[in-house]
């Protein structure tokens, strides 16, 4: 078994949405975000998300559910964990993002790659084709990209993504469910 985990960050490892909603309440009262993985909500929402991703707020996200506990356990059991987030390429925001992850989970990630804002993850995932890795994501289009490459794919269920089904995409509620499925 190749012990490789590929994971998105926001909505999977870190609780981006709660922190973003706190930011909205403070700076944009009355604004709402329904699905952080698409911009059908309008140009203004996309602009606010990009702005948020480049503020100091991005360095202080809390963990998503049981991510710290279970990813640490994976690491202790010899798994190599690689993250990919499409939060944008501001060097200072990226540094804060990496520090946030490292502060919550010291030495758990082998690497965190940060790609341009909202860029699909197909190119990043393609380097892992045939590796036996697993892929964890909350955005449907990126989950499908992984599944179509033959990468075992888990979709972290959220209010905005759990009403779809796709061959090769397994829906899960938390990291413990993934751990139990891949270590049995």
Residue ranges and their predicted role:
Residues 71-75, 129, 143, 147:
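Surface-exposed amphipathic alpha-helices with a cationic face
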Residues 134-173:
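Acidic, Mg2+-coordinating phosphoryl-transfer loop and its flanking beta/alpha structural elements
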Residues 58, 62, 67-101:
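Substrate-recognition element of Asp-dependent hydrolases with the DxDx(T/V) motif
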Residues 113-117, 168-177, 181:
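Short acidic-hydrophobic, aromatic-tinged amphipathic segments that line or gate anion-handling sites
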Residues 84-134, 140, 144:
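Substrate-recognition "cap/lid" segment bordering the active-site pocket of phosphatases
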Residues 122-129, 176-184:
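Short amphipathic alpha-helix with an adjacent loop that forms part of the alpha/beta core around
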Residues 1-50:
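Active-site neighborhood of HAD-like aspartate-dependent phosphohydrolases
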